């Protein structure tokens, strides 16, 4: 067995070595490249198939040789770099392909082009064989058509970098390719043999002999191949950008002219005189010195000469094919803030990796400047390697360590000396290291210091932020942040250091150049001195000075698109701005104007200046985009475009095209089966019935598609709009003045000839009623007389109001019916087509016009129908007369019989009639026998028939009389009749049919009676049930009223004794009873037992708390578990301990060092870096929140179930407003339940890091104030730390995302004046306790809730939005499903939150923030259980009023103010969007109709009359016709929905870099001056970067905690340097073991020990506060980021991947 296993192991290892060897892998990849088929295979197959004979054999050999040679060259180019560059560059392929295609074209076009007469065999002069060789060789190099992605061929290139012996790999891959090629050619040969032997194919070839002859003809094949190759190469050349037809970038001088158009238009128009004066000043200063002017002219000439000379110096190849030349890039990025603009360059990568010296070692930097690296390479080429001295890395590192130690010792000594001075000397600010400022040495005046913005000795926050303004001379005070003193005006630095990039200065200089005003140098010098010697008390108005310096021509230009060019042209026409040529392409658009200001309207106005009139009365219109795919995609005009070679377009218009390699990443895979399913459902819909709405939608879609087809037809024809416009105009004139008058004349002449009265007046009256309106391209009404702007080029429409239709006659008004009058008054309109026909809408199909002869034919048909109807009536009357005669005769006979006294039955049933007939037949048989025997002998011969019938009649009469007598006897004597039935069989047989008739009749009556009784019973049951239901509802309602009254009485009683009761924050008894009632009902319906999943955890612990004695052994396994807590928290066990249920000793204790990674632990203390799980997962490839020693504890899966039931639900005992726990699932409360659950789960996860959180209590303090710890003393400042707002609302931070387990949102509860709290046995309703927290929001106090309803109505939200007032509304109405105004949870924080999503301090997230000065953290509540306010506390206040609502009359004013605030929110730079609801099509149609009518009304004189007619016809919608649309009403009605536009979250390396390095952009509230120091009382215990507003620290009392932070002694720069030097030489002192599985290098040192939040923090808070201020301020991360202290996985030099941001040494 051992031998077998040994042999087997050796065999497996041998096989693995063989498989992994370079030769086998090369053979495999070479074999795969065989399937990369290109055009060269076509030449090879042609030579093998079509060529025959000796010459054919030579051509086969030459084709195979050329093919293999070309492939060999391709394989060699993989290894040999120059050959790879030659064959890989696009210009080389272009140079090779174009001449060869030309040569090949001439070879195939002329037959004797290569024929040199008779040649010997094996002669090299036979150029046709050489041509075959070149074809296969060159087209093997140009293998680019069939598989453009060339994925199989690139596998060889990829694997070559992974092996060491590259030449062996290339050789083996070439051999593998030859093997695959041989097999492929053998397969092709077998395929040809099979085709020749197949009979069906042979029959087809024989039937098409001419086709075979054509294929055999060499010229036709050569022509086919030449065409095919031409198409192939054109397709290939279309993939590369055109290097010839492109445009140069505009020069810098031209681009500077564009910047003047960014100025304010109104200022430019209104301040002409002032600007002219400024221009004089500018010229006076700039051109006072003529030397500057000469210098500029010489510099410009020198630039032009350098450019021209530089063009000829370049090599020809680089001049034509250099992709880094003057050509424009492909894309141009526009930023939202309009400050960061620029185009995208190919060579500008996101990261640039290069080696540099960092920490004394060679490290890879990913942000190395590319220009510096190229400069270093250029220097290295110039300087020989022998002159450079190489220093070993060890020497560099030791030198670096030595210098750092010296620096550290010096700083330590200085720091120690300053601290000793503090201990001996009084506290003085002189001991603190002051900031070094640049000032005049002679005068030590503070005012002579240079402004902080330009002070080179200041950096960071002290220099402030530079804001780029339109005016360079005005320095805004707000741009210099954290400046306590106001700097006086100093204009010297403004002249020496002007504000850069000033469009105002450039504008004034350019104007002065245009006017060419010359002012001598003396005046200029005088003006300069006056500007320097200024009075500080003067107004801050400066003249713009051109900056001294040179602007580099790198991305200094500014590009505009076609839309901007169009508007600038319009402004130029209006005398406002100048037009420019566009450089960016946009979608095709048309400006649709419905109101223009012409000279005619100017004459009617009160303006005297036409330009002024055009400025204040601009044309009104909007931009309409054509509905077609936009493939230009904002591409720069005349740029080199590269087609996407790997892109596959599935449909005619695809929004996000990409390679098929990434189809698996798509959520909706575009598999053809989806199209088949759609086809199946469409067929099913066609076969079935459709509703009216579907039919209308389909008709609308068909109309829209037809309209788009017609528009596309006119757009594609050259000069179509001009010809169409002229034809429309001609058709309107022809219709108006020629066609219709001729028709009227012809009609009236015909009426005269037919001896009828003519209708000249009526016809011409209808003709004059017709109105022709000129409309724009989309059909918007423009004017009756004026044409739209550019109507000949852009096209226009002609709309006809009340179109004239010729009628054969007119009825008089007296004869008009109501229907005719209504039809006459109806408004009708249509559009004129090019053919003179009418259509309902622009570019629509022609409609059917009423025919002239149709009324005549209708009249004739009507008369004919009347005659037919009269004839039918006459025939019917004749038939009725005949029937009436018969009926009269029948009645007459019946009356005669009645007069005789005979009873004649009018109605005889069928059964009785049949029974009588049978009896008659029997009687007739018997009687016939008797009569035949008796009378046959005595009757005479002539009277035989008559006597026989007479005898029969007599016999029947006698028989009837006997039966009637018997019936009467039976009625009298019933008993005798029954005895006779038993005895006499004959009588029994006669009585049975009569009894059956009676029974049958009785059964029918009984069935009918039973059915009627059943109906009556059902009716009575329904009536009884209705009474019972009404009674039940009445009883329930009265019961609720009584319960409510009892609850109110109980709450009034408990207001007195509320301090004596222990409040337990569980669910109320009413909720429990209601839930159990629902459970019992569900149990009755489903007949199942109770399950544990129906009970929530709160209910279980409620029952546990209510029991007096608990068998502790049953709960020991749960309550005494020492491992990680799965679902029970410490405060639950603390509560049971206080209740006396079990001891504290059995509580599970928190294990030491079970915290999280200290790096993450510290980052979580700073809200800027408290990222979500998904964000961290992209940076750190590990699970979130590992346990100790990299052990992931088992996690309760119920925490991650979003829509799971309330099973094992965590609850927050320390919350002030109780969470309702619904035991059964409810759709209306699904969002509320999930939101609370997510909030609690977030706190549960964060409870380890926050010692003052809701769900945390230290395990080392078991018996500390147990009697007063029934509620937690909340630290309101920490709430934003527990539930931080971070990043911004993106796809990775939405609460509805299933993967998101890290909650980010604030749980809001709006406290009203009545607050409901759940207690043990009853509901407690009580007023607010005026115990305001540290932060609270004021609102006007009133007893009614109407003002709050006004607030929510204004916001477009229901009153119980997000459940904030659900406790108030429980007593008034049932909870409805709320419609949310905004998708995220918070609205008030939204505008602040969007400004700087990750750098806003927590306390600034509140607006109108008030600080209660009487608030103290250490409030001791002994016997009185008061309630703290919520963090978001809408509490009554008398100092400030959020809404100034004094009476009902002020409501309107407050609403207007609130609407203005909402408009500011919308108009601001916030990513909000307005979304239409489902009524989009209807509202759009109404809006378009109103716009058409508005455009017509504005251009008319008599507006009132026509507008009233429009309103009467209900064509103008008055609901939409408002001057200012009320946004709140639109949102309240559901027409508009405001929701945030989700910003795209680009979680890449650049995003995290900016987050870390951008901490220097701290909010201005954190900028504190050096003279002030922090108050530890004002800082949250676990949130050290929080700062307090300055007015909070004015009236503070001096306490022991107001100690100076030692680090503040040094300056920020020295302090930073000391921290970094200390961190370099720290030892590994981490208590928690960390497994370095991210890095493979073992020599990387660990970072310094972070502040571990352990029990020492609770004992020595003040010391740790100081230490934390010392070691980890906010600048710590900035220092490490600026020093490029990051770590990369650099084991493999060919791949660079930033696994995570790693801090070391």
UniProtKB/Swiss-Prot annotation:
Chief place of localization: plastid
One Pfam short name: Ycf1
Keyword presence, Transport: yes
Spans through the membrane: 18-38, 67-87, 127-147, 175-195, 218-238
UniProt keyword terms in alphabetical order: Chloroplast, Membrane, Plastid, Plastid inner membrane, Protein transport, Transmembrane, Transmembrane helix, Transport
Compartment(s) where it occurs, according to its Swiss-Prot or TrEMBL record: Plastid, Chloroplast inner membrane
GO BP, one annotated term: protein transport
Membrane disposition: Multi-pass membrane protein
Task performed by this protein: Involved in protein precursor import into chloroplasts. May be part of an intermediate translocation complex acting as a protein-conducting channel at the inner envelope.
Quaternary state and interactors: Part of the Tic complex.
Protein name: Protein TIC 214
Organism: Helianthus annuus
